[in-house]
């Protein structure tokens, strides 16, 4: 299993293809609960550089920070897991 760094994730996001992006079941629940628009999240991942990329709580997991969809004083936090095939959105929330 390849171990990715924050720099690797930045490069992967720049070259991400829509078929390689997967939303986990848990993230879909959060989208509904928090009224976060899936299209907004996809737009951020495909078209904007994250404000910051931090390592997540387990190997190949990362926290990406983007501007909030609803509140300019908050950030959208997107937790992803990366493997050789996909980028999986595990969870998201506004901070």
Locate the predicted segments by residue.
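Ribonuclease/tRNase effector modules and their secretory precursors
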Residues: 1-95
